[in-house]
């Protein structure tokens, strides 16, 4: 169904029918529920902190109580990419998205400065993340706000 057909269909419905359909979508589909929960109660700071914790655990996992060793770092870029994509889908402020993009790179740099990493793919991945972050920041017109962090990341490499 095209957008035009959908608009026509929705225009023919009464207010009560529209409300019923939205409630049904809200109950049936988790992404719709997540979206509306965020729209009516946007806790961006809480989301940002949770995302930063998840990303930092990818590089610096926490030892569980009673465990003999700390788990090995997984260093998955995909975890941060999924979080960033989720933030964009929710319509989170571009400053917060840019912050999480740069945080991902900064934590990866911190890890690589403390640990020797053989895989060249890791460094290519971080470079891709950096390029995406800079492109996002420039395209949203917020470069001056993040210039110091971008320069710090560039100087670290």
Please name every model-derived segment.
Residues 1, 13, 27, 46, ...:
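Alpha-helix boundary/N-cap detector
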Residues 2-66:
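N-terminal interaction modules that seed assembly of large macromolecular complexes
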Residues 27-31, 53, 57, 78-82, ...:
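Generic structural signal for well-ordered, non-membrane alpha-helices
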Residues 52-86:
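A broadly used, surface-exposed interaction patch
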Residues 64-68, 116-117, 139, 143:
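Charged, low-complexity interaction regions
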Residues 81-118, 122, 129-134:
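Extended amphipathic alpha-helical scaffold segments
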Residues 121-157:
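Eukaryote-biased recognition of C-terminal alpha-helical segments
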